[in-house]
Structure formats: structure tokens, C-alpha cells
């Protein structure tokens, strides 16, 4: 049974401090006493520098840190303290996010090319997902896998506050990722996506409305139950990429805020991790089996890392 596209229902928790900050200009919020109060002043270390608009970090089984360069069009790898270019699907490529498949391939969402894959051992590139019902995507952004290997990705570009036609898609693993289902269809630039440890729901960040949605899975038909707004954010242009730790805490990069929000399993913001410089925090990755959270920043093109309280979830590709 093919599920209907979910209509989003706006409910859920909205923190009091979000209401207070609603009247504060966004450029002032990142310096606000409230965000300073949320900071634990964790030491943040510089790992590497280079590239053009860094995004989509991931670790492979050998411990290599990969990422994408949105403006450069490259899938790249951190070597020492440098960002080294490895593969490009096309001169027109604009990769946005990346995730590791269990077979070793790296899946890349691309604003112009859909979803393509790279096999590090053979260096093979495959343009895997180009169209939905014969039509090109608006511009895929971020992605994640569930524990069955199904791929979820957001389709974000050309959408915004005045055109809430962004979407969340699922590509079925059993079909070789050829069977696509649109799960959500009315989002204002959907961005990050993640599945918590219990596997019963999926989070989707909606950048242009500065909030996250949580959508419970309806496992009877492979779709979703009605979604609800789980978190509103306090600064920046909106939520970008996310990662989740083994206890269900969400780490949310927020674009133009110079930092990362930490959200507890009850959807409350409990901490703001500020990076030393660069405002364009784009995405995150946990070093496998550790509490080290790696952060890409795209204004000054730095990779940072910070030690948090819990070990990160093990991605499906590393299980």
C-alpha cells in the first residue's frame, strides 16, 4: 500500500525562550545572553581547513573522514589538516550531503544531479536517482538510512516561506533504490534528517521556518503518521544538518548561528555549542564509538570537533 503524502500538523513544544526571542533580530540572537547561558564552554578543536563550502561529513570503516564541497562540486576527504578532493560526478555537480552505505559506497545528495554514489575501492560513480515520476527534483539536500537500508532524503531547493513545496522522499532498498515514495510534501526548504535510536520516527529540519518536525513511522503501510513540530530554534537562518547520539539527544547545526544546538529526547533545547569562528555551521558527524562530534563550517571552510556527553549513534553503514 502506498501511503498518502503527510499533511503536517503544527503542534508540540515551543520553549518559552523561543517566544521571548521572537522579537529579537536574528543577527543579535547569536550574541544573546540566553545562548551564552546555554553554553557549557566546551573546548572546540580545529581539525582541518580547506575546500569550498563544506557539508555532509561522514566516517567510513577505516576511520577516514569524508565531506562534500557544495561550491567546488567535490566529494572530498580529510587528510591530516587538509581537505583533499577525491571525486566529482560532473562539472555541474553541487553535492549537499553524504552518507555511508553498508556495502562501502558513499551516497551523495546533489542539488543538480539527484542522488549519486561513489565506490572508494573502484572509484566508480553512479547517477542513481535522477527523477520522481519523470520529473527532476527541486534539489536534494540531506539524507540518512534506516536499519533496513532504506534511504531518506530531503528535496529542498527552489522552496521557501512563499513556496512550501519541499519534500521528504524514501527510496526503497529492496528495489535497488528505484522505488520512490514521497512521505511529506509541504515543507519550506527541508534540510537535515535523522532517525533516533528506537527507529520509530524520523526528524526533519525545516530551514526557512527555523524548526524541526518529528514524524512517527506508520509501519503498517510504510508511511508516516501525522507529524508535529518538535523544536523551534533561537537564532540563525534555520536548522541545517543533524546527528543523534545513542541516548536520543539531537545535535542540530544551525546555519548562520556559529554553533550547534543540543536537544534532549523531550525536544527541549538544553545547550548551544559555539564554534570559535565562522557562522555557517552546516552539518555534523560522530567519530564511530566515541563522544567526538565533528562539525563542518562553510563560511571559513573549517572542520571542528568537540567532545559531548554521550557516544554517537552508529550509522547503519557502520553496523
Language-model features: where?
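Bacterial N-terminal signal peptides
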Residues: 12-25
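Blade/loop signatures of beta-propeller domains
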Residues: 30-42
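A short beta-strand motif characteristic of beta-propeller blades
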Residues: 43-48, 83-88, 126-133, 178-184, ...
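A short loop-to-beta-strand structural motif that recurs across blades of beta-propeller domains
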Residues: 74-76, 114-116, 167-169, 211-213, ...
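Blade-level signature of beta-propeller repeat domains, shared across WD40, Kelch, NHL, RCC1
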Residues: 285-319
Amino acid at each position: 500500500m502506498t501511503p498518502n503524502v503527510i499533511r503536517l500538523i503544527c503542534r508540540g513544544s515551543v520553549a518559552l525562550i523561543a517566544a521571548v526571542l521572537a522579537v529579537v533580530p536574528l543577527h543579535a540572537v547569536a550574541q544573546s545572553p540566553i545562548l551564552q547561558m546555554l553554553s557549557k564552554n566546551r573546548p572546540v578543536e580545529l581539525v582541518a581547513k580547506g575546500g569550498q563550502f563544506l557539508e555532509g561529513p561522514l566516517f567510513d570503516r577505516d576511520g577516514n573522514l569524508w565531506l562534500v564541497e557544495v561550491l567546488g562540486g567535490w566529494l572530498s576527504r580529510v587528510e591530516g589538516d587538509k581537505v583533499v578532493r577525491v571525486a566529482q560526478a560532473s562539472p555541474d555537480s553541487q553535492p549537499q550531503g553524504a552518507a555511508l552505505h553498508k556495502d562501502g559506497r558513499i551516497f551523495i545528495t546533489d542539488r543538480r544531479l539527484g542522488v549519486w554514489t561513489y565506490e572508494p575501492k573502484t572509484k566508480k560513480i553512479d547517477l542513481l536517482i535522477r527523477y520522481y515520476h519523470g520529473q527532476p527534483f527541486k534539489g536534494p539536500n540531506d539524507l540518512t538510512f534506516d536499519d533496513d537500508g532504506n534511504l531518506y532524503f530531503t528535496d529542498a531547493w527552489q522552496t521557501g516561506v512563499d513556496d512550501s513545496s519541499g519534500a521528504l522522499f524514501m527510496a526503497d532498498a529492496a528495489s535497488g533504490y528505484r522505488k520512490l515514495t514521497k512521505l511529506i510534501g509541504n515543507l519550506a526548504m527541508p534540510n537535515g534528517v535523522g532517525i533516533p535510536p528506537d527507529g520509530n520516527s524520523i526528524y526533519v529540519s525545516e530551514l526557512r521556518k527555523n524548526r524541526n518536525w518529528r514524524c512517527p513511522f506508520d509501519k503498517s503501510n510504510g508511511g508516516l503518521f501525522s507529524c508535529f513540530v518538535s523544536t523551534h530554534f533561537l537564532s540563525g537562518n534555520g536548522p541545517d544538518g543533524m546527528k543523534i547520539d545513542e541516548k536520543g539527544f539531537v545535535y542540530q547545526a544551525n546555519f548562520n548561528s556559529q554553533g550547534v544546538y543540543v536537544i534532549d529526547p523531550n525536544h527541549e533545547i538544553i545547550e548551544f555549542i559555539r564554534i570559535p569562528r565562522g557562522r555557517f555551521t552546516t552539518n555534523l558527524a560522530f567519530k564511530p564509538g566515541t563522544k567526538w562530534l565533528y562539525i563542518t563550517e562553510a563560511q571559513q571552510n573549517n572542520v571542528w570537533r568537540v567532545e559531548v556527553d554521550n557516544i554517537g549513534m552508529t550509522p547503519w553503514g557502520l553496523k
